[in-house]
Structure formats: structure tokens, C-alpha cells
């Protein structure tokens, strides 16, 4: 009888304990169910590299290109329900494909914008290189985009955003995400005098972001700034008009900051703000992960910079007719000369040695350390084309060379 009583008491206690735990478990499960996970993917400075190819050497690359980025983007979309894809500018300039062919015929389907449309971008921020061919050409090319192009700090002579938008609001699972785009206000330093450039006004980035946040008001749960500039000033040391750090200092409402322009990896957190930036030509992608609670407040956030080295390029992107044709046209332009008939031009000569010697110090090009044939060539071309008496140049691309 005593054993039976002990069993009955034990059973009652077990049932009572289980019952007491049920509400807590249900509460925890309910809270978890109300959390929302947002993944923001950020690219920038892709510099007209949809394929992942070095046209000067006629060789495939192994670690960059929009086709590799797209493979990774598709993987993330298959794993995460709420993905936002942003770009921070400098995309339509940078290779022979654009600079020598497609940007000279802006009414034609543009391979970079075609690729970005295929990849499903949600928004893009203007970069300074988008202005290289003047305002009219820029608008014709970017007008092909199926997504908004943002520049909250650049307005035309009529006081309108030069691209038609300074910010946009996206929605994922009920979470409203405001994306504010700002470009470096230093554009006139590089492109002043080109068509329409000096008709625009270029405002300090932090000031424009503050105004955009005021306009957005309570419409958004998250504030994302996509800035085509580095963290620290490039020219305006005193006021920080071209500093992304100044944006954060003046606008505590910002949750995510994407930086660009400097072609360098940035991966850090300041307080609760996640900050990311990537290297150029599609070498890396920034991944921001945020978790929001039932009140749509950020309770966890992180940033990761993902390298594209070894990633398989997307055949879907490469097989797109516009992109495939542009790739072949660029190779033909190099190998067949620039004549419309596609025939090779006259031989200008032959190289007897590399124009830039092998680096004596790893990652420090000889063209930046001493007199080299590659720098002599650049200066002679500048003298010939400008009619100047003196030419000074610095090596822009560390690997610039003419092989033996």
C-alpha cells in the first residue's frame, strides 16, 4: 500500500511539474515565432566585371565577378526567407567592356545593368564613377535598372534628386526597411566640366542622411545607409562631408552602414551599428544579419565579409544573351583591333621584357617604387594626347603591365 501511495504521489508531482512548464515553453516558443530575421547582402565597386574575366590578359579570374556573387546570393536566398540585396555604386565603369564599348552607346542594353536586373537588386547607390560620362549618359544607362538608384545628397538644377530618388522603403515579413543612399560629394573634383556635372549640388552626406531620416519619420523599422565613401574623410578633413563615420556620429538612428569607394574590407561594429565594406570587382560581398523582436526592435546583429575565391560562377548569368554577347564583343575588341570590320590593326611593336618588374617586396608593386617602363609609357601617352610639357602619374592598378 505504501509503494502504491508513493507511486501515486510521484505521478501527481510529475504531472504538476509538466503542467507548470508548459506555459513557459509555450511562451518561449511564442516569442521565438514572433522574432524576424533579416539578411542584407551588400556589394559595391564591381567596376564592370559581370563575367569574372581579365580582358587584357584574355584569362578567366578565380576570385571575383558578378557571376560568382550571384551564385552566393542564390545560396543565401535558398536558406533565408528575408533577403535584401543592395549595391553601393561604382558599377558601370572599370573594364574595356564598358569604358571602350558599351558606355559609348548608352541606348543599347547595358551588360552591367542587365546583370544587376537578373540578380534581383532591391536598390543601388550612385558611385562617383557613374558620373564619368556626364549626367545624360549616366541617366540613360541607369534608366535601364529595374530597381531605384539612390543619391540623397545630389540634386539637379531644379532641386530634384539627380536619379529621381534619395531613399526607398522595402518590406520583408512585415518589417519596413528604409534604405538611404549617399555618394561622395567630391564628384566635381574628378569630373567637373563634364556634361551636367556642375549643374548639380553635392551636399554633405551626414546632412542629407539626417534630412532623409526626418522625411522617413515613423515609416520604417530599420534604417540602412548605403554610402559610396569610406569611413574617414577623403578631402574634407575639417567637416567630414565625405565621411561615413560622420554619418554615424550625427545620426544615431542608423542600424546598418554599408561603406564603399576605398576598395577595402571593412567589418566592424560600433555600438549596435553593423558596418561592412568590400574589395572591388566582385571580390567580396558583405552579409548583415539582424534579428528583430515582436516589437520590431533589433535584438541581435552581425556582419560578415564573404570572399568569392573558389566560388563557381553562375551559368545563368553568363548565359544571358546580353552578357554573353558583351563578353565576346570585348574579347574581339582586344584581339581583333578596334575597327568595325573586326580586323586587326597594324602592329605597333613588340615587348622584349615585362613593363613592370616582379615585386621585390610582396604586395608592393615596383611601379610605385622606382622608374619602370609601365610608368614611362603612361606618361608618354599623357604627353602625346594632352600636348603638355610635363606629365606626372601614379600607378592606379598595382598589376598594370605589358608582358614580354
Regions found by a protein language model. Name each.
Residues 28-312, 369, 374-381:
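Acidic, metal/ion-coordinating pockets
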Residues 27-35, 61-66, 77-80, 218, ...:
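Non-catalytic terminal accessory segments
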Residues 1-12:
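Bacterial Sec-dependent N-terminal signal peptides
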Residues 18-27:
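C-terminal segment of classical bacterial N-terminal signal peptides
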Amino acid at each position: 500500500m505504501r509503494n502504491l501511495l508513493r507511486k501515486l504521489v510521484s505521478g501527481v508531482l510529475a504531472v504538476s511539474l509538466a503542467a507548470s512548464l508548459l506555459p513557459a515553453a509555450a511562451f518561449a516558443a511564442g516569442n521565438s515565432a514572433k522574432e524576424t530575421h533579416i539578411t542584407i547582402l551588400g556589394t559595391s565597386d564591381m567596376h564592370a566585371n559581370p563575367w569574372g574575366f581579365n580582358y587584357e590578359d584574355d584569362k578567366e579570374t578565380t576570385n571575383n565577378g558578378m557571376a560568382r556573387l550571384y551564385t552566393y546570393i542564390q545560396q543565401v536566398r535558398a536558406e533565408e526567407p528575408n533577403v535584401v540585396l543592395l549595391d553601393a555604386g561604382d558599377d558601370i565603369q572599370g573594364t574595356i567592356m564598358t569604358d571602350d564599348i558599351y558606355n559609348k552607346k548608352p541606348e543599347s542594353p547595358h551588360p552591367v545593368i542587365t546583370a544587376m536586373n537578373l540578380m534581383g537588386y532591391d536598390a543601388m547607390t550612385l558611385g562617383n564613377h557613374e558620373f564619368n560620362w556626364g549626367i545624360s549618359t549616366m541617366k540613360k544607362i541607369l534608366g535601364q535598372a529595374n530597381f531605384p538608384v539612390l543619391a540623397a545628397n545630389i540634386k539637379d538644377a531644379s532641386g530634384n534628386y539627380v536619379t529621381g530618388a534619395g531613399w526607398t522603403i522595402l518590406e520583408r515579413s512585415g518589417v519596413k526597411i528604409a534604405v538611404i543612399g549617399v555618394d561622395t560629394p567630391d564628384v566635381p573634383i574628378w569630373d567637373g566640366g563634364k556634361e551636367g556635372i556642375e549643374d548639380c549640388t553635392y551636399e554633405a552626406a551626414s546632412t542629407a542622411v539626417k534630412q532623409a531620416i526626418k522625411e522617413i519619420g515613423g515609416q520604417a523599422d530599420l534604417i540602412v545607409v548605403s554610402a559610396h565613401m569610406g569611413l574617414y574623410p577623403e578631402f574634407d578633413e575639417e567637416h567630414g562631408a565625405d565621411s561615413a563615420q560622420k554619418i554615424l556620429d550625427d545620426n544615431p538612428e542608423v542600424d546598418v552602414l554599408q561603406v564603399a569607394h576605398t576598395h577595402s574590407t571593412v567589418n566592424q561594429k560600433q555600438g549596435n551599428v553593423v558596418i561592412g565594406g568590400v574589395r572591388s570587382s566582385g571580390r567580396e560581398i558583405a552579409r548583415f544579419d539582424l534579428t528583430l523582436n515582436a516589437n520590431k526592435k533589433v535584438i541581435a546583429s552581425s556582419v560578415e565579409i564573404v570572399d568569392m575565391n573558389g566560388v563557381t560562377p553562375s551559368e545563368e548569368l553568363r548565359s544571358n544573351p546580353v552578357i554573353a554577347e558583351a563578353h565576346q564583343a570585348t574579347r574581339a575588341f582586344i584581339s581583333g583591333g578596334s575597327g568595325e570590320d573586326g580586323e586587326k590593326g597594324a602592329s605597333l611593336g613588340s615587348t622584349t621584357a615585362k613593363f613592370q618588374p616582379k615585386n621585390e617586396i610582396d604586395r608592393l608593386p615596383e611601379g610605385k617604387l622606382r622608374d619602370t617602363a609601365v610608368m614611362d609609357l603612361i606618361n608618354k601617352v599623357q604627353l602625346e594626347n594632352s600636348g603638355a610639357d610635363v606629365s606626372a602619374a601614379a600607378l592606379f592598378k598595382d598589376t598594370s603591365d605589358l608582358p614580354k
